[in-house]
Amino acid sequence: MGSCCSCLKDSSDEASVSPIADNEREAVTLLLGYLEDKDQLDFYSGGPLKALTTLVYSDNLNLQRSAALAFAEITEKYVRQVSREVLEPILILLQSQDPQIQVAACAALGNLAVNNENKLLIVEMGGLEPLINQMMGDNVEVQCNAVGCITNLATRDDNKHKIATSGALIPLTKLAKSKHIRVQRNATGALLNMTHSEENRKELVNAGAVPVLVSLLSSTDPDVQYYCTTALSNIAVDEANRKKLAQTEPRLVSKLVSLMDSPSSRVKCQATLALRNLASDTSYQLEIVRAGGLPHLVKLIQSDSIPLVLASVACIRNISIHPLNEGLIVDAGFLKPLVRLLDYKDSEEIQCHAVSTLRNLAASSEKNRKEFFESGAVEKCKELALDSPVSVQSEISACFAILALADVSKLDLLEANILDALIPMTFSQNQEVSGNAAAALANLCSRVNNYTKIIEAWDRPNEGIRGFLIRFLKSDYATFEHIALWTILQLLESHNDKVEDLVKNDDDIINGVRKMADVTFERLQRSGIDVKNPGSNNNPSSNDNNSNNNDTGSEHQPVEDASLELYNITQQILQFLH
């Protein structure tokens, strides 16, 4: 630290040799003494701060330089919350035209900006404007320290929008193209910190940062690559930005696909996450596959790194939404690795994305359906169905519901004893889980060539199909009531005597249907609907001469439509009993 004051003797410029006032000479003497015992003193208050402040306000350039260097060294070692009295002299130094002072003052402010409270106070005291001015200068060290300080300030949420609207983004974008790697790192890091809110991302895009970030994906520096891939990943969260990227950045996808093979694990992960966000749009779902993304993704979902597995399975999940990609994904060898991901019981997200992808692939071509069953996906999903978080159960039940829609899959599902999972799932308190399970169960009761498994599951497990029908008839939830009635009708239309007898001879089921018929009939009567002539409606609210009541009529229309549909199904069922 003694070197901070040694410049008093050597400089020859006029400001350096300005006469030193007595109070300044005293401050120098005191400061040298304080520095000898610096580990025992607080330089942010009392005598040490007063001595430093005296030097800051001196007309002698050497004294200002000494103060700046002292502040830089002290703040590097001792970082804590400070007062306005500490920041004010540093901000004064920041406005100096002397490069040495600028470098040291920016460094000191950047050091203090590590503290969360200081970040807010620096911006409140007008620190952004002089920092922006320093960024726009020619001195590389000054640029580097000024950008580093803004990077630190931008980690505080309260500051982000102020920085975004301060005029800092354009010089930051310019400095991101600097030939000096330290400046480039700090600038891209600062831009990344500005991508955590939609409003700030919009400012960033408007400042022209996107083409720079995309071009820097080719950087040989892993830090710059990481900052740029992460920033672009965040920018791609917004639909408007994805559309703009699609129009203006034709090489973005191919660059990100290449980075999935980066030696840096975090770059690889962020590139994959960026592709995941882009794949929210249909056009990108196709483009990622065309750019050769599948071989990288199938390798990454088998990685030992959980963040990489999560990023890659989330990406393939989005890509699998597009029907044209389904066969290509299956051919690329994803099915068995996806099934293995269902064993990640410590990661609910990985399980959810894996099941969701399997669901998207399940009901495509006959070839894919066959490979799906051969992969062990049904058995693994059945195994997890009753022993996994609700979010995973929801995805599994949706997968079963999709599979059960295809007539060619029904017997395979029944032979896999899927009813052992579906029936208990109908008890779930989560309506999505119970509804999907019930829909799958209903479809499996419709148009199958062999009803042996249906008959075996009539009253077991958990009261069996019979119990499910009775519970859903009593649910007071129109969707569930509809599923129960439709299932009963399918069983009665099965042309299987044993199945028909099970339904017809069950008083609880038949009484439930009759009660539903009575309730829906009364509901429709109260609404003025003649169930014997549905086209006739006595409700005055629908009368052309009473147009002011149209809103009232439209409010009740969905309920009336649901009641009419339920009533009609009950009548079809009851005809089988005559």
Swiss-Prot record:
Give GO BP annotations, semicolon-separated.
autophagosome assembly; autophagy; Cvt vesicle assembly; establishment of organelle localization; lipid metabolic process; macroautophagy; nucleus-vacuole junction assembly; pexophagy
Please give the residue ranges the record annotates as the region Disordered.
527-557
Tell me the membrane topology, using the record's own terms.
Lipid-anchor
Q: Can you locate the Glycyl lysine isopeptide (Lys-Gly) (interchain with G-Cter in ubiquitin) cross-link? A: 77, 515
Q: What is the effect of changing residue 51 to R?
A: Fails to undergo self-association in the presence of NVJ1 or ATG13
- Record-linked InterPro entries: ARM-like, ARM-type_fold, Armadillo, Vac8
Top-rank lineage group of the source organism? Eukaryota
Q: Where are the ARM repeats?
A: 37-75, 76-114, 116-155, 157-196, 198-237, 239-280, 282-321, 323-363, 407-446
Q: Residues with N-myristoyl glycine lipidation?
A: 2
Keywords (A to Z) from UniProt: Isopeptide bond, Lipoprotein, Membrane, Myristate, Palmitate, Phosphoprotein, Repeat, Ubl conjugation, Vacuole
Q: Where is the composition biased (Low complexity)?
A: 533-552
- Residue(s) carrying Phosphoserine: 11, 16
Lipid-anchored residues (S-palmitoyl cysteine): 4-5, 7
GO terms for molecular function, please? identical protein binding; protein-membrane adaptor activity
Q: Does the keyword Heme apply?
A: no
Protein's cellular compartments: Vacuole membrane
**Outcome when changing residue 60 to R:** Fails to support the Cvt pathway, but does not affect the PMN pathway
What happens to this protein after translation, modification-wise?
A: Palmitoylated on one or more of its N-terminal cysteine residues by PFA3, which is required for vacuole fusion.
Would you tell me the Gene Ontology cellular component terms? cytosol; fungal-type vacuole membrane; membrane; membrane raft; Myo2p-Vac17p-Vac8p transport complex; nuclear membrane; nuclear outer membrane; nucleus-vacuole junction
Q: What is known of its domains?
A: Comprises a flexibly connected N-terminal H1 helix followed by armadillo repeats (ARMs) that form a right-handed superhelical structure.
Other comments on record: Present with 5680 molecules/cell in log phase SD medium.
Subunit info here reads: Interacts with NVJ1. Forms heterotetramers of two VAC8 and two NVJ1 or two VAC8 and two ATG13.
* Annotated function: Functions in both vacuole inheritance and protein targeting from the cytoplasm to vacuole (cvt). Involved in the formation of nucleus-vacuole junctions (NVJs) during piecemeal microautophagy of the nucleus (PMN). NVJs are interorganelle interfaces mediated by NVJ1 in the nuclear envelope and VAC8 on the vacuole membrane. Together, NVJ1 and VAC8 form Velcro-like patches through which teardrop-like portions of the nucleus are pinched off into the vacuolar lumen and degraded by the PMN process.
Q: Which family does it belong to?
A: Belongs to the beta-catenin family.
Mind telling me what this protein is named? Vacuolar protein 8
Gene that specifies this protein: VAC8
